[in-house]
Amino acid sequence: MQNFKELNEKIAWQKVDNLLPVIIQDAKTCEVLMLGFMNNEALEKSLESGKVVFFSRTKQRLWMKGEESGNFLNIIDLSLDCDNDTLLILANPVGPTCHTGDISCFEKISKNADFVFLARLEKLINARKNADENTSYTAKLFKSGTKRIAQKVGEEGVETALAATVKDKEELICEAADLMYHLSVLLADANLSFSDVISKLKERHKA
């Protein structure tokens, strides 16, 4: 977490009339969750608590996001933009961020973003790990055990390869979707995620 004094000195407070626009982004999915404002005190409280604290322009007071709902925004990282007049905060949200109950205040657009969909699918798959096997195919798959899940990944991998060899694009898309889904289940079964895979890809890219 950045030092308050150092960060505070960088901010162009006069330029923003002492109310700094703050963009909140999901640290895992990169989904934009909401926009709020901070004054000097709200920024300090945020850094002290590790949770996002805004200045409410309507209530004219500080308010910690989630103080009533429990849907806190836990700060992972933050950065000023190139003009030092907007702050980006990467956060781990506890529950939905929007007061309407949606995950994001920009739900109409964000839910259609490809990587956001994958991240939400991953969360849904994880939520089915301990569910009744009669409630969904995913829960039944988890109940069948690692060997069966791995077998399904192998089967879908072969079917994906076959679809590619016969140059059937539509079938390739369908089989690749099945493969990605079953791979997601296999990763979840091992308490891993696509983030772990991406980290390995990044590591190899640097080499």
Curated annotation (Swiss-Prot):
Q: Which Enzyme Commission numbers does its entry carry?
A: 3.5.4.19, 3.6.1.31
Q: In which pathway does it act?
A: Amino-acid biosynthesis; L-histidine biosynthesis; L-histidine from 5-phospho-alpha-D-ribose 1-diphosphate: step 2/9; Amino-acid biosynthesis; L-histidine biosynthesis; L-histidine from 5-phospho-alpha-D-ribose 1-diphosphate: step 3/9
Which reaction is this enzyme known to catalyze?
1-(5-phospho-beta-D-ribosyl)-ATP + H2O = 1-(5-phospho-beta-D-ribosyl)-5'-AMP + diphosphate + H(+); 1-(5-phospho-beta-D-ribosyl)-5'-AMP + H2O = 1-(5-phospho-beta-D-ribosyl)-5-[(5-phospho-beta-D-ribosylamino)methylideneamino]imidazole-4-carboxamide
Pfam families membership: PRA-CH, PRA-PH
Entry annotated with the keyword Amino-acid biosynthesis: yes
Query: What keywords would UniProt list here?
Result: Amino-acid biosynthesis, ATP-binding, Cytoplasm, Histidine biosynthesis, Hydrolase, Multifunctional enzyme, Nucleotide-binding
Q: Which residues cross the membrane?
A: none
- Residue ranges for the region (Phosphoribosyl-AMP cyclohydrolase) are 1-117
Phosphoribosyl-ATP pyrophosphohydrolase as annotated region, ranges = 118-207
Q: Which InterPro entries match?
A: His_synth_HisIE, HisE, PRib-ATP_PPHydrolase-like, PRib_AMP_CycHydrolase_dom, PRib_AMP_CycHydrolase_sf
Report the Gene3D superfamilies cross-referenced here. MazG-like, Phosphoribosyl-AMP cyclohydrolase
* Enzyme class, spelled out: hydrolase
Instruction: List GO BP terms, alphabetically.
Output: L-histidine biosynthetic process
**Nucleotide-binding is among the record's keywords:** yes
Q: Name one GO cellular component term.
A: cytoplasm
Regarding protein family, the annotation reads: In the N-terminal section; belongs to the PRA-CH family.
User: This protein is called what?
Assistant: Histidine biosynthesis bifunctional protein HisIE
Organism the protein comes from: Campylobacter jejuni subsp. jejuni serotype O:2 (strain ATCC 700819 / NCTC 11168)
> Upper lineage ranks?
Bacteria, Pseudomonadati, Campylobacterota, Epsilonproteobacteria, Campylobacterales
